Amino acid sequence: MHRLAFTKADTAKFISHLDLMRTFQRSFLRAGIHIKHTEGFNPHAFVSIPLPLSVGYSSSCEVLECQVLDTPLEEVPQRMNAALPAGITVQRCYEGVRPVKELYYVNYIVTLEYEAGAPFGAESAIRGLLSRDSLVMEKKSKKAKSGKVEVDLIPLIAKATVEERRDTIALDLILKAQNPGLNPELIVSAIRTYCPDAAPDYAVFHRRAVLDERFQNWE
């Protein structure tokens, strides 16, 4: 299995996961790169993204899996970048070795923005919130009859750094990636719930790295 490491930025942040898959399938065709297809009466290009990115997030560490058939891997980035839309950039193509189950953590940078500047005491309030022994929030769940389930966020947060930067507060978060994973939007929701005086006007999300259990880059 081969992997494409790519970035997603600017207007490409708003491409949904399904549309992103279709975009890559079309771009392989335009680039003249043959990849493995599914078998059957309606074969289609086999591509997958192990950790789909939420709409509106930027990322410098996305990974797409495929099987390149007859193109040297070192040629793939240049040819794909000529075919992909603006905001999506393939950095490299390589032979995947690590199984997806070893993708353990995700590093996010969440920027909390305030139109009138960060409120006094917001940084310490948020730091205190993320230092609690327990932080329970409701999240959507298809399995629950009510459509929601309570989850304690603290066991899913491996590391959290809070830093005020002029009119913003930056959260450097390392969160569980899967089984279960934690969406950083839940942390922003927790700030709005438990620290309303520190609630941002809006938040900007960036995925910076995908990591293994030892906090090393997963590839």
Region locations from a protein language model:
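Short beta-strand-to-loop capping motifs
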Residues: 6-8, 65-71, 110-116, 173-177
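Ordered, soluble secondary-structure elements with a strong preference for glycine-centered loop motifs
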Residues: 14-18, 70, 74, 120, ...
